[in-house]
Each structure stands twice: as C-alpha cells, then as structure tokens.
Amino acid sequence: MVTTPSFKPTYEQNTFKLSPTATTTTLPWNNTSLPTTPLFGTDGIRGKAGELLTAPMALQIGFWAGQVLPQYCQNPGPIIMGQDTRNSGNMLAMALSAGLTAAGLEVWNLGLCPTPCVAYITSISEAIGGVMISASHNPPEDNGIKFFGSDGTKLSSELQQKIESGIRGTANFPTNHSNWGQHYHRPELVKEYQASLHSPLTPGSLQGMKIVLDLAWGAAVHTAPEVFRGMGAEIICLHDQPNGDRINVNCGSTHLSHLQQAVIEHNANLGFAFDGDADRVLAIDSQGRSIDGDYILYFWGQSLSKARLLPNNLIVTTVMANLGFEHAWNKQGGKILRTKVGDQYVHAEMQRTGSMLGGEQSGHVLCPHYGITGDGLMTALHLATLVKNSGISLAELVDQSFKTYPQLLRNVRVEDRDRRANWKNCEPLVKTIEEAETALADLGRVLVRASGTEPVIRVMVEAINLELAKSWTENIVLAVQQHLLPTKD
C-alpha cells in the first residue's frame, strides 16, 4: 500500500482562495478560446502546446477535473501525475497542478515516467484518479492530458464530458471553492511500478539474450533499461536520454529503421521500439523484420491458451487487425472480436466478454493477468520471455505463424477540426470509398477514419495483393486531398 508522505510539501500553498460565490464566468482564467469540436478525443485532450494546450487551459482542465472526480470517486486520496520529456511538460504540469490544488485535491507528482506507471500507482494507492501529460507517439510540439479513474483505467466518457462542461461554462453540478490541496514530488514510487513488472516473471529469465531498446527520447529512458537489466538481459539502448526537442522524431515505434539496423549490426536476438510515453511497443526480429501488435497478440495468445489462461481462446482487437491474423487464429479454434480503434474500446469489450487478452496492431496490448492497462514495457518483457522459453528465435516464430494480407495505411493531414470531424458528410469522398468496397468485395477491406489523437484522416486499404491495395489507397487519398483540404488560390 502506498502511503501519504510524512515530509512537507515541496512548495507553499496557493496564495489565493476562490470565492465561494465564484462562477465559471468570474474565474480569472476563463478566457481561453475553445474549439467547437469536443476537447476529449480517443486518448484524452491533445493539441499543439501553446495553442490548444496553454497554461490557462491546463489550469481550467485541472480545476474542473478537481471538481468532478470527488463527486464520483469514494477514494479520499490524491491524484497521481506523471509526464513524458516534452519541453511543454513542466509548464502544463505546474498549471494543471495549480488547477487541481485550487479545487482541493492533493497532487502526487511522479515526474518523468511511462503512462502505465501512472495507471499502476493510481490503482494501488487509494488515489482519487491519475493524470498523464503526454502526447504519446505525436511529434514534440504536441502535448496531451489524459485522466485515469481510481482503478487505473482511462476515465469514462461520461466524466470526461462533465469536465468539459465545466471548461465550457455549461456545468450543472455544485463546485467546491472552499479548500485547496497540496503538491508533493513522489518520484520514488516509480520503483514500485518497476517491481510490479518483474513480479510475475522468473528472476534472471532473460539471461543470455541481447536486446536492443529504442526509447524514443521519451518517458521510458530511465525505466526500461533498469527493468530489462533487472531480468538479466544484455541491452543496447538507442535514443535513451530525455530530450523534449527530439521525442518520437525519426525514432521509436513510428520510425523503426534505426532499430532494425541496430538489431542486425549488434547481432541481437530482438529489439523493441517504444513510443513517447511507453504505452505501446513494436518488436524487431533478428532479421530486421518489424513485428506488430497482431503478431504479438498471436504469440501471447498461443502461450496463454496453452496455460489455460485464455477463456474461450478469445482475443479482442480492432478493425485495423490484419485478416491474415484473424484467419490464422480462427484455424486454431480461436475467436477474434473487433472494436473501433482505441485501446479504451478494446478494454471495454474485454470487460464485457471476460477476455484476458486484447490490443491493437499499433502495439497497445492489454493482458489483465499482468496489468490494468496497455503497457509497452510489460508487453516487451513477456514477449522476450516467451521467445526465450520457446527455444527458437522470434524470426522462426514469425515464419511458423501466418502471412499477412498487404495492408497500406496513409495519413492525410487535415488541419480543420470541423472538416475532419464531419468527413462522412463529404459525398464525393464517401462515393470513392463505396466504389473501393464494391471492387474489393471479399478480397479486402477499406477503413477511413478521423484520428482521435492527430490532425489527420487515416486511410487503410487491405487487399489480397499489393497492387490492388495501392490502387485504391491512392484513389481514396486523392479524394481526401481534393475535397477536405482548402483550395489553393
């Protein structure tokens, strides 16, 4: 059990106290320009630091989260805070903490740590909730604020909407202005998270393995090396210093080329690439091939099934999962359920069905046997252990598994939030998509969606051959560019 610290706060109490009669229109920071589209996307609030995510906005977010959480959570404890390495992180952390403490909450700031660390510490500390300041795999100029409930899972859409109603001045619930909280630095709690990753595994189980880690200049730069060395692995680290200017830039889980080269050059057994907040991971085999979340789910599913730890051989994944994975799993007597893109949808379906394994092709993997949320470090440790115990290489496991259908994914940047949100009202684009679906029929799939984390429209085409996938991807991307982007004079 994590206990309240006995030492004094690291800085003084707030020097102001809100009037008990204050309203949203009289709050001193209530002058932030808000978009017409919802603030909360599939992974919290994200945007460019200094534009959408300013200090006044973070203050409001913190204050209204501090009003909402106590009304729906019985835990009397603190809110757990963490952040990645982005340059805007400290600014947002201080403003967010000011809002939370102004609302009467106590803040425990873990400092630099992976997102799953915040979720874990929240779940074991009787916390009222958690909050992570990160934009995950997004570029350095972006940032984000993501809340967790007291159980360490992502905050429900209902509570996110209540927080947003306060920010927008439409809240219809009572507010507390009579107390203020304290702020504590608690970086030592990160060690408890690291211990939780080791506890289900045999000490030294990775001895004899050489593993390359690409840490993306992000949240796992300190945690990941300690965790893997603690299991006996020999590790080579890439992009392993905190660097807010370079987080995710040409590295990590969205840019695998450096890791692929390093695995081959060092004759390593395998490699792992994390994103900026380390809640997802992709692997590289000894031949330099990328191993995505579909393969990770397949291998882990086989292992859990053999141990009788996978009820009904059910795996929950998203609409992005490759048909080759689904067909191979079905042939083994398994079952695949698909959800919308977003690990919160995967988690909800897992809860509904009692599934013990789920995840996304992008590398978010959830296994309730070992963790409460998607965790890149947990996934990497278990995959490495699985490979070691198999007696063969990851490359051999891949060769014995399944062939993927060619799948192309293109991201088209659309800055206009309204156009992104309402793309389905664009008749020429919808017509092009329908033509593609008719042409592909049973030979492939089309998926077009607005990203919930980046200002892009994602176009995915999967087909029985690469030429077919390329042709329809190009047609749909062209339609997006012609009809959703502003015309040039």
From Swiss-Prot:
Broad EC category: isomerase
Active site as annotated: S136 (phosphoserine intermediate)
Keyword Mitochondrion: no
Listed GO CC annotations: cytosol
Cofactor comment: Binds 1 Mg(2+) ion per subunit.
Positions of modified residues (Phosphoserine): S136
This enzyme's EC code(s): 5.4.2.10
The record's account of how the chain is modified after translation: Activated by phosphorylation.
Functional summary from the UniProt entry: Catalyzes the conversion of glucosamine-6-phosphate to glucosamine-1-phosphate.
HAMAP family linked to this entry: GlmM_B
PANTHER family: PHOSPHOGLUCOMUTASE (ALPHA-D-GLUCOSE-1,6-BISPHOSPHATE-DEPENDENT), PHOSPHOHEXOSE MUTASE
UniProt record similarity statement: Belongs to the phosphohexose mutase family.
UniProt-recorded name of the protein: Phosphoglucosamine mutase
